[in-house]
Amino acid sequence: MSSVAKKDKRTMSVTALINRAWPMTPSPQQQQQMVPSTQHSNFLHAMATPSTTPNVELDIQWLNIESGFMSPMSPPEMKPDTAMLDGFRDDSTPPPPFKNYPPNHPLSGSKHLCSICGDRASGKHYGVYSCEGCKGFFKRTVRKDLTYACREDKNCIIDKRQRNRCQYCRYQKCLACGMKREAVQEERQRAARRTEDAHPSSSVQELSIERLLELEALVADSAEELQILRVGPESGVPAKYRAPVSSLCQIGNKQIAALIVWARDIPHFGQLEIDDQILLIKGSWNELLLFAIAWRSMEFLNDERENVDSRNTAPPQLICLMPGMTLHRNSALQAGVGQIFDRVLSELSLKMRSLRMDQAECVALKAIILLNPDVKGLKNKQEVDVLREKMFLCLDEYCRRSRGGEEGRFAALLLRLPALRSISLKSFEHLYLFHLVAEGSVSSYIRDALCNHAPPIDTNIM
């Protein structure tokens, strides 16, 4: 059988796999017409008079802030779970650590520290040892000729935890440590010459897992936020829960802003028609946020679960909303989202850990979620389909290259997506039930963020 025939067969199997278990994305009208179940109808009464849920002061204990509101977190140290997952039961002996970075990742095996923030350096960039985040920050600042202002006394601390706090002081430290502006310009000129000699389809060829890993390292939390999620006068959230729910909406808006910048920089995505870009982001932002939450939450699966005999028999108790910030299960139960909380951890986080999913596979799946040719209203569905098929092939090749002995791994990874879609639809029911989504403005917010050439997103390694 020829290589072409093999490729066609693999593509067909992927399509069948997704279409069999993955329902279509609902239109905005369908989402607004969602009728809450009996469970949701009783939700307001249950929250007004809690009887069995733990007594938690939500305004104080709703969020567990570990190391600063915007402080970054390194990728979780993944551990293989060799025990059979029986519900939430996980009483196996902790397995050996799993390597965070694939062999070809820029941070694999680094022995130097970033001269600017002290994080692990990925090499010498523009004259000094630096991490991917500071490298990207300096490059974007020079290329876009950005100017910053310091809100303090121009002597802010720039380290791994606080490098997002002040762009002015971070840029000044880059210069003081020896980063050269001219090196960025020379790099751009070399890239332009390579582009002129490239094949016309180079934009699709550039879509690779390696490129996605670079983008993941450059995306940081937003200094500002969109207003897609909000608690307004028309919201059906009881008064005692409005403050914590508003905090959750604020977190979601910051993550959506960062997501838009990430999507815009994916090779060839920015060349799609702007209306198609908006539809793709609008159709996937909720799934992408939940997927990122599940990925970050792997690190906390065993926290606060031990009984007296030190056996992990209770469900996972913590979910990581964003780097440095967790939500406790008790608070989720009181807010009426306990089912979604448990499903994210049981159907996504635990399965990710069991599969020993690494960051390369994570970013590939994120791109596959975004590049959904079945989104209604696309003008260039074929272009999106080509990009998604490219990501299928990249992920399949990566699985065979890095996990050659694990047959069926590619399919096992894709089978997490139907569960993600199901959880996403359930969470949408809650968002629309309490009028937390500014539906009429979602498209305009996304359009403004996509068209903004100087996004309010600092570039920093996650």
UniProtKB/Swiss-Prot annotation:
Locations listed in the record: Nucleus
SUPFAM superfamilies the UniProt entry points to: Glucocorticoid receptor-like (DNA-binding domain), Nuclear receptor ligand-binding domain
Origin species: Bombyx mori (Silk moth)
Residue span, NR LBD domain: 204-453
Chain residue ranges for the region called Modulating: 1-113
Keyword Hydrolase on entry: no
Tissue and organ distribution: Abundant expression seen in males and ovaries.
Subunit structure: Heterodimer of USP and ECR.
Zinc finger (NR C4-type): 114-134, 150-174
Official protein name in the record: Protein ultraspiracle homolog
GO MF entries: nuclear steroid receptor activity; sequence-specific DNA binding; zinc ion binding
CC per GO annotation: nucleus
Chain intervals for the UniProt region annotation (Hinge): 180-201
